[in-house]
Structures are given as C-alpha cells and as structure tokens.
C-alpha cells in the first residue's frame, strides 16, 4: 500500500502486510541504548511496525554536514512520515545548528506535545497529588526561529517571530488534543502583559478559537504565574498551550514534578510528519554503562502507537510499564539510586515479562483518535482594510550620549518630512530625557515620525537613512505601520 492519509488527517506508510513503516534514529550518547530497549518491547508486544534505521546528530556533524541531518535520513522521513528518535547531541554556542531543531523545522512539526503524569513508586514531593497534564508547545516560531544578528560588537539581537497562522494552529491542536483525551480545561500561558504584539497574538488566537469549543473551559494565564501555580497546585492543570520558549521551560518544570526527564516523553507533530522522542538529552557520561532509564523513549513510542491508531498495542505496553513500576521490584538507578538500581536490560526484560498484566492502582487514560486541525493555508491569512507607514525606527551604533545624539539627528532630519520623536536604549527612552538613570550601551533606537501627506514613501525613508548614515553607523530599520488605524508597533518605556 502507498502512503495513506487517515480520516483524522494523519499521514503514514502502510506496507502490504499491514505493518506501518517508521524511521528509527538511535541518536547519540544514551540514545542507542534507550532505542534498543524500546524496540525490544515493541517487538515483544508484536507492534505492527517495520523500521528504516537512519542517523542524525554527532556522527553526521563529524562528517562535515552542518545541519546534522544527512539527505538519506531526510528521504526516509519523507517516505515514512513517522519517526522514533533517540536524543541527539546539540552544539553549544558558535557552530552547527541543533539537529533536533533542524528536524522539527524541516518538517514543520509545529506542535510539541509533552504529557506529564504521576508514576507509581517514583519518589517526588508531589506523590499522591494526581498530576496528569499535557504541555502543548508551539514548536517552530518564537525565538527558536534562530534569526540572530550582532547589532554592534557588544549587542546581540534575536527576532521573536509569532504569526497568526502558527498561533491558530497550535491553539486548535491543543483543543483537539483535549477532546481526544477527554480533558475538560485548556490553559493558554503567555507573556502578553509585556510583549503585547508577539505573545498577544497567541492570546488573541486562543480567545477566538476557544469559542468553537464550548465543551472545554478556556483560561488565559500569565506564564510566570503558570510556573508559580504548577509548583503550588499542579493538579489544577489539564492542558497548557504556550509559545516555544515558554513551553520549553514549563515542560521541563512539569517533568520535575513527576520524577525527572527519565519519565518525560514527547511528540513533535505536523500536518505531514510526526517525530517521537524523549525530552531528555544524550547524557554521554552514562552511555554504554547499561544503567540508564529508557522509560521516556518507551513512552514516546507509546505516543507514536496512538498516533498510528494502534491503541490496543499502546495500552498493552503502557500497562506493562505501569505494572512494573507499581510492583517496585525492578527499578532503574535514577529512581532508587545507582548503587542498587536495575540495569537497563533488566528493566526492559521486566516490562516484557509483564506484557498482558494490568496495574492495580494506576489507570491508563482512555484515548480516542486525534484529529489534526485544519487552518487557512494562505500565506497571509489576515488582510487589513487599510495600512499606512507612519514613520521609521533607525537603529544606530554610537558612543555619543543621548542628548548629543538627539541634537545631531534633529539637524540631519531638518528639511525632510520626518521629525525625531524619541531615542531609546535597550527599550527605555533616553531622549528627550525623562529623568531616569539608564546604563547605556552603544545601540540606540531612533524613532522618526512622518509629517508629510499620506504615508511615508520608500524614497523618503531611504533619503532619511542616507542622511543618518553620513554621520552614524546604522544596522537596522523598522517601518512603523498602522493597520486599520491601529499602531503595529509598541512604545518605549517612558515614551508618551
């Protein structure tokens, strides 16, 4: 059989014998051990799967492939559409891109799903609280777009990109997931009180889409309060949908509530491809010692089976895992201490021996087929009735103090249809002076407002920039636009 699309919108490769073909990437560090243990359990459970094993990560970087993902791996994923992946080493600082992020962005796996639940016999201060929640993290936008520039030799900039399309997709995904898992409440965590345009886009999308799901309670929460509430009363949460950076932080926090990253699976799901992996890293210091806990990768495989709509096999494996933990005789070193913890192979064998058994105290949640949400595919889904360029922010590098810079820019703008409105330094207005005490850096935003008829024209803007450039080094321009009469830009701290 060829690549098929299910009634719920998922794409998968089904072989003639009915098995579903997936790509397996063993990964780096402890990854191969975790994946090997998981494949043994899948095979013992007679999961109807076939595998193509491919590589990514450290070995690929060593071959000089800067993305960390070779073409043969990309071709396999395009064929199978489903990936089970071990952790990959991530370069730190300068150098290659993260292969993890490359895979997510290459295949537009826009939804990162990280379930968290209490496990039996896993020590945690929250034992008995009934924690059972899912963090749904937008996976390709935000600061993780990775668009960075050195503005001056000592000032760096990262662009935080949040789109309406990306926000609507992740919000719809969260509500559909809540329905499929029988959950009754979705929280949206943003920092829209500070980043009113970027983070505010997710908040506005959430409030609009929530009206289509009257059976689910929709609650907006500021992200720092979400972190506070997760520590104080985590059982109040069922689904949290949030932006990329916020989700990265909150999901690691939630995994700490239930015993650590060894019990934290995840899925990266898009309209075309789904990638399943543990949240934890490659932990090279434990590699090859047969002591690691493969539970996170195994639970990621359980998530994969449910995505493939192999619910019976998923329940079989999850029940065996929960029975093993509940029994408490064979537990790994991260749970009971490495001096007396079971070997990885012993733990894996215990789970296999418990296939077909049901835990007495811990129940597996009921799952229904999850429907991938559909959104407007237009590149520009929002078309304003009117728009107007009302000015320009010119970013310059200089060691001048604000008053000297302001006077110089006012002289340079004389005779143009622009007036200098204000100058800010790291977001705080420093000219005209407000009486504040600002520690300055060599990066100024200089805001010019248009005083001519209609809107500012490109030749007029370029003439202004040319005048500024005759005296100062500039590195960045931003048009100030109004959409339907509303400003598409924010004010500096202290700006009137």
From Swiss-Prot:
GO molecular function, a single term: isocitrate dehydrogenase (NAD+) activity
EC numbers, comma separated: 1.1.1.42
Residues the entry annotates as binding Mg(2+): 248
Free-text remark on how the cofactor is bound: Binds 1 Mg(2+) or Mn(2+) ion per subunit.
Site (Critical for catalysis): 144, 191
Residues the record lists as binding D-threo-isocitrate: 98, 100, 104, 114, 137
Cofactor: Mg(2+); Mn(2+)
Domain of life, per lineage: Bacteria
Record-level GO BP terms: glyoxylate cycle; isocitrate metabolic process; tricarboxylic acid cycle
Residues involved in NADP(+) binding: 88, 90, 193, 229, 232, 277, 281-283, 285-286, 293
Reactions that this protein is recorded to catalyse: D-threo-isocitrate + NADP(+) = 2-oxoglutarate + CO2 + NADPH
Keywords noted in UniProt: Glyoxylate bypass, Magnesium, Manganese, Metal-binding, NADP, Oxidoreductase, Tricarboxylic acid cycle
Family: Belongs to the isocitrate and isopropylmalate dehydrogenases family.
Subunit (UniProt): Homodimer.
Protein function: Catalyzes the oxidative decarboxylation of isocitrate to 2-oxoglutarate and carbon dioxide with the concomitant reduction of NADP(+).
Protein name, UniProt field: Isocitrate dehydrogenase [NADP]
